[in-house]
Amino acid sequence: MDKFRVQGPTTLQGEVTISGAKNAALPILFAALLAEEPVEIQNVPKLKDVDTSMKLLSQLGAKVERNGSVHIDASQVNVFCAPYDLVKTMRASIWALGPLVARFGQGQVSLPGGCTIGARPVDLHITGLEQLGATIKLEEGYVKASVEGRLKGAHIVMDKVSVGATVTIMCAATLAEGTTIIENAAREPEIVDTANFLVTLGAKIAGQGTDRITIEGVERLGSGVYRVLPDRIETGTFLVAAAISRGKILCRNAQPDTLDAVLAKLRDAGADIEVGEDWISLDMHGKRPKAVNVRTAPHPAFPTDMQAQFTLLNLVAEGTGFITETVFENRFMHVPELSRMGARAEIESNTVICHGIETLSGAQVMATDLRASASLVLAGCIAEGTTIVDRIYHIDRGYERIEDKLRALGANIERVKGE
C-alpha cells in the first residue's frame, strides 16, 4: 500500500486550482443512466471513486469515454445489476438503483462499502423508492427494486436529512408519473448541482437548495452538457492548510458561496479572507491561528467533511477549542493519530476538546477515512521532522493529486509506493 512521507515544518503559500466536486460528480454520473441520449459532463475530478463509477456504468451497458470531459451514452444499457466486486469499495453505487428502476422498471445493487464512519444505512433510499411505488427485496446481499409500468409521484417526508437518499428519490422521481414533493430534503450544493444537471436534460425540478424539492415527472430525458461545481471540501482543506502553516493561498476555480460557514470560522481564527466570483484568498500574515468552536450539522451549517481539518487547526491554535460532531458517530478516529504527533485532545461523547500547542512532532500515523487522512497529511506539513502517513488509498478516493498540489505550495511530500 502506498504511503506519504512528509518533511516539516513548511509554510504553505501559493496558488491551487480546485477540482470538480466528488460529491456532485458521483450522483451526476449515475443520474446519466436516466438519459436516453448521450451526455457530456465537464470538470469531473480524476479520482478512484469516479473510475469505479465509470467502470460500473460500462458494466451496465453504457458507453463511457473520458477525454477531458466524461461522455456517457446510456441508450444501450441492458444489464440492471451492480455487482459486489465493484460496489464493495464505494457507497455511491447505491445511486444506480433509482435511475435503473425509474427508467427500466428494475435494478439491483449489492449492499455498499466505502468509508467506515458510523451507521450510514440505505434504509432511507429504500423507503423513498417504495413510496414511489417500487417493490424492494433484500436478497443474497443485494437490494432488488422493481416496478410494473412507471413509478408514481408521491409526497415524501424524510425521517432525517440525508444527502444520499435525497439524490436517490429526486433522480427516480424525474421519470415518475405525476408530481413528487420531498420534504426535509437535504440542501447541500451537490444536491443543487445534481438537480441542475437533470434540468439540463429536460427534468422539471424546483426548490433544490431548500428543504422542499418538487419534481414533476417527465416521459424521458435527453442529451446535454453540464459542468460539475468546484469541490468545496477540497477548497476548505487547502484554506486550512494555509491557515495552520501561517501562510497565504489563492484558490482558483472555487465557489465561495458554498463555503459560508467554513469561511466564517476561518475569519474567527484570525485569517484575512477575500473572495471573488470564482476565487478565495486567505492570508495569515505569519500569525498563529486562534482556536474556534465548531458544531457540524447539515448544510448550510458547518460541514462534517471539514471537521477533521478544523480539529487539526484547533490543536495548533492559540487557546482551547471545542469541536462537536452531530452528523456521524465514530468520526474522531484521526484524534488518537494526531495525539501520536504530540497533540493534546480529549474526546467526551461527540465532542473533542482541543488544547492548542505551538508545534507538532513528526510520527508514523495511519489514515482511517477520507477527511481524517487529509488532516494527517496537513499535520505532517507543519510538524517538526518526518511524518509517514499509511493507508493513503483513502485520500485517493477524494482528493485529486493532493501531493502535487501541496508540493506547488511548498510542501516537502512524496508518495512512497507500497509492496
Swiss-Prot record:
Task performed by this protein: Cell wall formation. Adds enolpyruvyl to UDP-N-acetylglucosamine.
Biological source species: Salmonella gallinarum (strain 287/91 / NCTC 13346)
Cellular compartments per GO CC: cytoplasm
Protein name in UniProt: UDP-N-acetylglucosamine 1-carboxyvinyltransferase
First-level EC class: transferase
Family to which this protein belongs: Belongs to the EPSP synthase family. MurA subfamily.
Pathway(s) per entry: Cell wall biogenesis; peptidoglycan biosynthesis
Residues where 2-(S-cysteinyl)pyruvic acid O-phosphothioketal is found: C115
Gene3D superfamilies registered for this protein in UniProt: Enolpyruvate transferase domain
A GO BP entry: UDP-N-acetylgalactosamine biosynthetic process
Entry annotated with the keyword Cytoplasm: yes
Gene that encodes it: murA
Binding site for UDP-N-acetyl-alpha-D-glucosamine: R91, R120, P121, V122, D123, L124, K160, V161, S162, V163, D305, V327
GO terms of molecular function: UDP-N-acetylglucosamine 1-carboxyvinyltransferase activity
HAMAP family cross-referenced by the UniProt entry: MurA (MF_00111)
The protein's Enzyme Commission number: 2.5.1.7
Active site: C115 (proton donor)
Subcellular location: Cytoplasm
Residue numbers binding phosphoenolpyruvate: K22, N23
Lineage: Bacteria, Pseudomonadati, Pseudomonadota, Gammaproteobacteria, Enterobacterales
Alphabetic keyword roster: Cell cycle, Cell division, Cell shape, Cell wall biogenesis/degradation, Cytoplasm, Peptidoglycan synthesis, Pyruvate, Transferase
Catalytic activity as recorded in UniProt: phosphoenolpyruvate + UDP-N-acetyl-alpha-D-glucosamine = UDP-N-acetyl-3-O-(1-carboxyvinyl)-alpha-D-glucosamine + phosphate
